[in-house]
């Protein structure tokens, strides 16, 4: 591994099928944590930090310093552990600047009133499309890739050759396809264009997924390449038109159930991982 190559490690959470990532610059020991998970029991409403503590332990073992706590979007299927990790490790919580749109939409749905600022100010940094940033000496670029939600971002990390992209819920492994677009603010046509934006990267670019649902009961996989997605993705491989994709995605979305954790997840995640204020009886 050269000093310009990132060390990337994935951490799979079987309860939510979510993959969190640690991205380390070996030269400087600076790192980013992407799409962390705060464990949540929907029956009791209790949280735990078991998944996040795996990241804590690994950061300590690597003697690394956290610069970024990155969110690819406001997740609807798990709660972020970013505030906990920030308290323990430091770093800036970052998300796409269109988080304000998500807060506007869900602020109305959840009737948050003035309790939730709808300008993204809960986050430490709001990324613009194409914005350059760094993890240690690693050069990175934020790409706005909406469709699943209005605020979805992909983060591209250069390694001096083809690089790696953390694509959130834009794409899945080729045998599972693409993300749903039926949440408020989602749009299948927009997602098609965002996917093409990702697939315009060099064909050997590594793509790191936010989820793997193990179709057919196969083993967990969460890394593919641009080339593999172009030729093999069951929803958007070469030859599938925009109209065909939109029709397929619309039909499929109509058959899907809502995620188990959508109500707590969106309320917490649009607040950068902070819980809503307690009600008058002290219960959140």
Where are these regions (language model features)?
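Accessory terminal helices/loops
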Residues: 2-7, 98, 186, 193-284
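Conserved beta-strand hairpin/beta-sheet module of binuclear metal-dependent hydrolase folds
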Residues: 4-65, 155-168
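Short Gly/Pro-enriched turn/cap motifs at secondary-structure boundaries
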Residues: 10-14, 116-117, 122-124, 144-148
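Conserved protein kinase catalytic core
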Residues: 31, 41, 79, 175, ...
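Active-site metal-binding loops of divalent metal-dependent hydrolases
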Residues: 36-38, 74, 98-99, 148-149, ...
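Active-site HxH/HxHxD metal-binding segment of metal-dependent hydrolases
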Residues: 38-139, 163, 231-232
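Histidine-centered catalytic micro-motifs
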Residues: 69-79, 143-152, 208-215
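A contiguous binding-surface segment within folded domains or other stable secondary-structure elements
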Residues: 157-207
């Amino acid at each position: 591994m050269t000093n310009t190559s990132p060390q990337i490690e994935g951490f799979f959470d079987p309860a939510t099928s979510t993959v969190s990532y640690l991205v380390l610059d070996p030269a400087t020991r600076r790192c980013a944590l992407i799409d962390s998970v705060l464990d949540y029991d929907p029956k009791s409403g209790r949280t735990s930090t078991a998944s996040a503590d795996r990241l804590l332990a690994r950061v300590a073992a690597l003697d690394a310093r956290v610069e970024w706590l990155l969110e690819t979007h406001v997740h609807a299927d798990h709660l972020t552990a970013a505030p906990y990790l920030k308290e323990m490790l430091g770093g800036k919580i970052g998300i796409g600047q269109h988080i304000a749109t998500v807060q506007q939409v869900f602020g109305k749905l959840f009737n948050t009133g003035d309790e939730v600022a709808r300008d993204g100010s809960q986050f430490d940094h709001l990324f613009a499309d194409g914005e350059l940033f760094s993890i240690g000496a690693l050069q990175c670029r934020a790409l706005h890739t909406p469709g699943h939600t209005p605020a979805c971002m992909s983060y591209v990390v250069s390694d001096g050759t083809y690089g790696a992209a953390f694509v959130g819920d834009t794409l899945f492994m080729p045998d599972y396809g693409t993300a749903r677009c039926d949440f408020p603010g989602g749009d299948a046509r927009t997602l098609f264009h965002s996917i093409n934006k990702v697939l315009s990267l060099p064909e050997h670019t590594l793509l790191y997924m936010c989820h793997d649902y193990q179709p057919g009961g196969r083993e967990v996989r969460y890394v593919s390449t641009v080339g593999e997605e172009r030729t093999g993705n069951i929803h958007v491989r070469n030859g599938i038109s925009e109209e065909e994709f939109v029709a397929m995605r619309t039909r499929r979305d109509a058959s899907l159930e809502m995620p188990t954790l959508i109500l707590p997840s969106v309320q917490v995640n649009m607040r950068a991982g902070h819980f809503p204020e307690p009600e008058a009886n002290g219960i959140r």
